[in-house]
Amino acid sequence: MIVGLRGTIIRLEPMYAEIDVGGVIYGMQMSLNATSMLQTKIDSQPDAPVKIICAQIIREDAHLLFGFCEEIEKQTFERLIKISGVGPKVAIAILSTYTPTHFAKIIADKDIEALKKVPGIGVKGAAKIMVDIAGFFAQLLQSQEESIAPSNNLKYEASLALQSLGFKRNEIQKVLEHIEALSVSEIVKEALKRLA
C-alpha cells in the first residue's frame, strides 16, 4: 500500500499531479486546495523534492491514488468515503470546495445549504453526510483541544482564530507555548508576529 511519496512534481493540474520518485512516475487525484498548496511549495522552492501523503483505493478495474498535503485532509477524505453514497469523486469535490477546517465548521453549524454547494451533493446527500461525519469532527476537535492544553481557554481560542487564518496547528502550538496568557486578541497579535 502506498501511504506517501517524496519526489519531484513533473505535472500539476488543478486536481491532478504526477510525481517522479526515483524514475517511477505516479499520477494522483488531488483536491484544488491540495494542488494550490503544492503549487505554492513549488513556487517557493522549485528544485526541492516534495512529500505527498497518499490514500490508495484498489478496485477490480482500477488502482486509484489520491494525494494530500496535510494529514487532516487525508483523514477527512478517508472518513468521507466510508459514508454510503459518497465516493472518492464526491469526497475530493468536498475537499476542493472547503478546507477540512471550514468543512468541520459547516458540519458543526449544520449548514446544509453550504454543503449543497459542492458539485454532486443534493439535499439528501448533504443531510446524510452531516449525520455520518459529525462524530468524526467531534473526536478531531477533542484531540486538538487536548493537545493545546484545554485548561487554557485563551490559548485554545487564539489557536482556533489562527487556524481560521490558515496557519497549521503544529506551528501554532509551538508559538503558543512561548506566549504568556493575556487576552485572546493579544495572544493572536503576538502569535502573528512570530508566525510571519
Swiss-Prot record:
Keyword set, alphabetical order: Cytoplasm, DNA damage, DNA recombination, DNA repair, DNA-binding
Main location: cytoplasm
Region (Domain II): 70-148
Region of interest: Flexible linker: 149-157
Classification via Pfam families: HHH_5, RuvA_C, RuvA_N
SMART domains assigned: HhH1 (SM00278)
Region Domain I: start-end pairs: 1-69
Gene Ontology annotations for the cellular component aspect, listed alphabetically: cytoplasm; Holliday junction helicase complex; Holliday junction resolvase complex
GO BP term, pick one: DNA repair
GO MF: ATP binding; four-way junction DNA binding; four-way junction helicase activity
Presence of keyword DNA-binding: yes
Keyword Lipid metabolism: no
Localization per Swiss-Prot or TrEMBL: Cytoplasm
Ranges where the record places region Domain III: 157-196
Domain remark in the UniProt entry: Has three domains with a flexible linker between the domains II and III and assumes an 'L' shape. Domain III is highly mobile and contacts RuvB.
Assembly with partners or alone: Homotetramer. Forms an RuvA(8)-RuvB(12)-Holliday junction (HJ) complex. HJ DNA is sandwiched between 2 RuvA tetramers; dsDNA enters through RuvA and exits via RuvB. An RuvB hexamer assembles on each DNA strand where it exits the tetramer. Each RuvB hexamer is contacted by two RuvA subunits (via domain III) on 2 adjacent RuvB subunits; this complex drives branch migration. In the full resolvosome a probable DNA-RuvA(4)-RuvB(12)-RuvC(2) complex forms which resolves the HJ.
Protein's job: The RuvA-RuvB-RuvC complex processes Holliday junction (HJ) DNA during genetic recombination and DNA repair, while the RuvA-RuvB complex plays an important role in the rescue of blocked DNA replication forks via replication fork reversal (RFR). RuvA specifically binds to HJ cruciform DNA, conferring on it an open structure. The RuvB hexamer acts as an ATP-dependent pump, pulling dsDNA into and through the RuvAB complex. HJ branch migration allows RuvC to scan DNA until it finds its consensus sequence, where it cleaves and resolves the cruciform DNA.
Family: Belongs to the RuvA family.
Entry-linked HAMAP family: DNA_HJ_migration_RuvA
Protein name: Holliday junction branch migration complex subunit RuvA
Native organism taxonomy: Bacteria, Pseudomonadati, Campylobacterota, Epsilonproteobacteria, Campylobacterales
